[in-house]
A protein has these predicted regions:
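Metal- or metallocofactor-binding catalytic centers and their adjacent structured scaffolds
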Residues: 1-3
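Proline-centered loop/turn at the N-terminus of a beta-strand
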Residues: 7, 21, 101, 152, ...
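Residue-level detector of short coil/turn "hinge" positions at structural boundaries
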Residues: 7-8, 49, 175, 204
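Flexible hinge/switch segments at interdomain interfaces of large molecular machines
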Residues: 12-17
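Metal-dependent enolase-superfamily TIM-barrel catalytic cores that perform enediolate-based chemistry
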Residues: 19-148
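Shared catalytic-loop signature of beta/alpha-barrel
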Residues: 120-129, 135-226
Length: 226
């Protein structure tokens, strides 16, 4: 792009849209704080979609809800965590209303049966999509989740090439393929994945956490508008 003096999207075939739907991940030390912040994120930042994950007890403290040197938590069970996840999502939906899309990341925490239970309970509250309900190499489990739920599924941030994406895309087991452009090998591989996904009516939602560079986010934007 720099050599030719052109934006990347033009080298990829030209711009087909002027705007890209973006979301922001809602951060907070506790679930209560995250739920309260969700509405302010929407109002102050003009967001149409937000992404969240409930903090959960874990072996070394708390995951997403505490600090490393904080007080130890009590033992927990999957049943408690399922309830915690569903209750948190409902609370956030009540805070932001029906017009805002909510992305929820299960982050491979649950068994396929547990993921199915959670997603079914969330269906009336209209998630924008559920991210990573099972591990990336568990295609049979992903198929089970797909067949037994109706919420859109996003998947693929740990994939390293288009070849690893094939079963999820060609089987139409996901609604969004969510690869990390750096992890899969760059712009060329990402473009091939996007074309493959479009063939099977799968959308792209490139992985864009806050620990990647602004350059990577810029690449995501150019891929999305081209």
């Amino acid at each position: 792009g720099k050599v030719t003096g052109q934006p990347l999207y033009r080298l990829l075939g030209g711009k087909v849209r002027d705007k890209v739907l973006c979301y922001s991940h809602v951060l907070g030390k506790t679930n209560e704080e995250k739920a309260a912040l969700a509405a302010s994120y929407v109002k102050e930042r003009g967001l149409k979609v937000i992404r969240l994950r409930a903090g959960a007890p874990a072996a070394n403290g708390t995951l997403g809800g505490g600090v490393q040197d904080g007080p130890k938590v009590e033992p927990w069970t999957p049943e408690e965590e399922i309830y915690n996840t569903v209750e948190f999502f409902i609370r956030v939906r009540e805070q932001v209303g029906r017009e805002v899309g909510i992305i929820y990341d299960l982050h491979e925490r649950f068994s396929p049966a547990q993921a199915i239970r959670i997603i079914r309970q969330l269906e009336p509250y209209d998630p924008f999509f559920i991210e990573d309900p099972v591990a990336p190499d568990c295609i049979a489990s992903l198929r089970s989740v797909r067949e037994k739920t109706s919420v859109p599924i996003a998947f693929g941030e740990l994939y390293k090439s288009r070849h690893e994406c094939l079963p999820a895309i060609t089987g139409r087991l996901v609604d969004y393929i969510r690869c990390d452009v750096i992890r899969i090998g760059g712009i060329t591989e990402a473009r091939k994945i996007a074309v493959l996904a479009e063939t099977y009516d799968v959308k792209t939602a490139w992985h864009g956490p806050n620990d990647v560079s602004p350059i990577t986010h810029a690449v995501n934007w150019h891929l999305n508008v081209s």
